[in-house]
């Protein structure tokens, strides 16, 4: 499959399950999918990010070689849909200290941003909680940020995820 063929197939929702199966059977196609998700400006290139997300559900090992590139891409990504998928995928993976350092600042800015949709901010909040689990000294700061967002920029998604994450962080703080 070529990138042009992938673009054509991705245009139709009816082809998405076929593409998932085809890419899982032929992991070389995964790189094409990643390139389309990261670098293409095609209006429906967010579907490539959606496919990466769906494939990750059953084959997370395919994403590992591209995780650092995804972390770099998320900081310049303009599409909220693609950014949401990228942050969700990042939140599901173990991160190096260097990746955590970058993402800590990025996710705080993203969470506090009134310009980002709630779905993007929720995944940024999840990444912050994941980092706090590995770096317990950050728990008080992250708790304050999440609670502030819940108080001042409340949406259903922020409230729902925020309550769960605050409870987990407070429980972790009690163990320190």
Residue spans for each PLM region:
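Alpha-helical scaffold domains
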Residues: 1-176
